[in-house]
C-alpha cells in the first residue's frame, strides 16, 4: 500500500487518458489507476490497489474518465461590442465592403474596445472565460489586437493578466498589434508597422505583459515584408512568435513564421506542401480553427493529410472572436475539426492537450498526465474521450482540478 505524505491528494479508481504518446493505447488510456498530487504537480501514477479506498485527501472516482485539462491555444476573448448586427446584414445581402465603409468590421470592435473602461472589459472577458473553464479548460491563450494603438493594446493585456491573477486558470498572453491597419493609418501600413515595431512591441515587452508576438499575414492583413519586420523585431528581443497565415490565400506566411522557429502557424487553410515542410523543419505547430472556416462559409480545407505525412503536430482551438468565430466552446471546435477537416477524435484530443501545449511553449509542463507535469485535469462522467467530441452540446464535466485543487 502506498503511503501518502502530509499534503498529498489522491484520485483513485480512475480511467486515465494520459495523452502520453509513449503509451501504446488510444488516448494513452489506462484503467484502474490512482493519480497522486503533491504541491500542484502530478507526483505519481500507480495502480488503484496501492491507494486506500478512503481516507483524508483520497477521492474515489468510481471508474470515471480523467483527461488532461483542456488547452485553448488561440482566442481573442478580450473585446467590447457586438458584431451580430453586421452578420445579419451580410446574410441579408449587404456586402462586407459596404459594412466596413460604414465603420463596421474589425474597426467596429476596435472602436468599442478603445472606448470601453478597463473594469468593464474585464467583466466581459471574465464571462467568456468562465464558459471555457466550465468546459474543462485550464490553460487559455488570449490575444490583444483590438486596440491597434499602445494604450488599448496595453489595456487588453492588463485585462488578460488580471484574469490569470484572480481565477483558477493559466493564461498565455499574446501581443497581436499587427492584426489590422487602424483607420488613423489608412493607406499607410508602413507607418503603422513602424509604430508596432518601434513603440508597441518594445514598450509592452519591457512590462512583460505578453509571452509571444502574433501577426496577420494575409491579403487583407499585412504583407510578407511587413510581417517579416514584425518577426525580426520580436526575435531581436528574444520574444517567441506565431502567425495567422494562409487563411484566405497562399502568401508564404507559414514558411516565413517557420523560418523564425514560430511556435505555431494558425488557420492554414491554403497551406501548401512547401509550407508544411517548413513547419516540420521549424518545429512549428499547425493550429486548426474550424469555427472561422464554418462561420465564413469557406471551402478550402487545411491539408490535414500533408500535415500527417510530415508529422507536423496539429492543435485545435476555438478562435473565439466577434467577427469570424463567435463560438466560445472548445468542445464544439473539436467536433468541427473532425467533421469539417477530417481529424480523428484522438487527433482532436491531442489538439487540445499536448499539441496545444506545444503551440504555447508549455509542452514540458502541460497537456499530458505524467509524473512531474502540472496537476491540471478533468474528471468526466464519461467512459470514452470520444464522447466529449461526439456530442458538443452536452457537457459531462464532473470535476475540474487546477494545480491539484478542485475548482
UniProtKB/Swiss-Prot annotation:
Signal sequence annotation: none
Pathway noted in the entry: Amino-acid degradation; L-histidine degradation into L-glutamate; N-formimidoyl-L-glutamate from L-histidine: step 3/3
A GO cellular-component term linked to this record: cytoplasm
InterPro entries: Amidohydro-rel, HutI, Metal-dep_hydrolase_composite, Metal_Hydrolase
Residues noted as binding Fe(3+) in the record, renumbered to the chain: 74, 76, 244, 319
Class of the enzyme per the UniProt entry, highest EC level: hydrolase
Protein name: Imidazolonepropionase
Provenance organism: Salmonella arizonae (strain ATCC BAA-731 / CDC346-86 / RSK2980)
Amino acid at each position: 500500500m502506498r503511503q501518502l505524505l502530509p499534503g498529498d491528494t489522491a484520485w483513485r479508481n480512475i480511467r486515465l487518458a494520459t495523452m502520453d504518446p509513449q503509451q501504446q493505447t488510444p488516448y494513452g488510456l489506462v484503467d484502474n489507476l490512482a493519480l497522486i498530487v503533491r504541491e500542484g504537480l502530478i507526483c505519481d501514477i500507480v495502480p488503484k490497489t496501492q491507494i486506500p479506498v478512503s481516507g483524508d485527501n483520497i477521492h474515489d472516482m468510481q471508474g470515471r474518465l480523467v483527461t488532461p485539462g483542456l488547452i485553448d491555444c488561440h482566442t481573442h476573448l478580450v473585446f467590447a461590442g457586438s458584431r451580430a448586427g453586421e452578420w445579419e446584414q451580410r446574410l441579408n445581402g449587404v456586402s462586407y465592403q459596404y459594412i466596413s465603409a460604414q465603420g463596421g468590421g474589425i474597426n467596429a470592435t476596435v472602436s468599442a474596445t478603445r472606448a470601453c473602461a478597463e473594469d468593464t472589459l474585464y467583466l466581459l472577458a471574465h464571462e467568456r472565460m468562465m464558459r471555457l473553464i466550465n468546459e474543462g479548460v485550464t490553460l487559455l491563450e488570449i490575444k490583444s489586437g483590438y486596440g491597434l494603438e499602445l494604450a488599448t493594446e496595453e489595456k487588453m493585456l492588463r485585462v488578460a493578466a488580471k484574469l490569470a491573477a484572480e481565477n483558477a486558470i493559466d493564461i498565455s498572453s499574446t501581443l497581436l498589434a499587427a492584426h489590422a491597419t487602424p483607420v488613423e493609418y489608412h493607406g499607410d501600413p508602413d507607418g503603422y508597422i513602424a509604430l508596432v515595431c518601434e513603440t508597441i512591441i518594445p514598450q509592452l515587452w519591457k512590462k512583460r505583459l505578453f509571452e509571444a508576438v502574433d501577426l496577420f499575414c494575409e491579403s487583407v492583413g499585412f504583407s510578407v515584408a511587413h510581417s517579416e519586420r514584425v518577426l525580426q523585431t520580436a526575435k531581436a528581443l528574444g520574444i517567441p512568435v506565431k502567425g495567422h497565415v494562409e487563411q484566405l490565400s497562399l502568401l508564404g506566411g507559414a514558411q516565413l513564421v517557420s523560418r523564425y522557429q514560430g511556435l505555431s502557424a494558425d488557420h492554414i487553410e491554403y497551406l501548401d506542401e512547401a509550407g508544411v515542410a517548413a513547419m516540420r523543419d521549424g518545429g512549428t505547430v499547425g493550429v486548426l480553427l474550424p469555427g472561422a472556416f464554418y462561420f465564413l462559409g469557406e471551402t478550402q480545407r487545411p491539408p490535414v493529410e500533408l500535415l500527417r505525412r510530415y508529422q507536423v503536430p496539429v492543435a485545435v482551438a476555438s478562435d473565439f472572436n466577434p467577427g469570424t468565430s463567435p463560438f466560445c466552446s472548445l468542445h464544439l471546435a473539436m467536433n468541427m475539426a473532425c467533421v469539417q477537416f477530417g481529424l480523428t477524435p484522438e487527433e482532436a484530443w491531442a489538439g487540445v492537450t499536448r499539441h496545444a501545449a506545444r503551440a504555447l511553449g508549455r509542452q514540458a509542463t502541460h497537456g499530458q498526465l505524467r509524473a512531474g507535469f502540472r496537476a491540471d485535469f478533468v474528471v468526466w462522467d464519461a467512459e470514452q474521450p470520444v464522447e466529449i467530441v461526439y456530442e458538443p452540446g452536452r457537457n459531462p464535466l464532473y470535476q475540474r482540478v487546477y494545480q491539484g485543487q478542485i475548482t
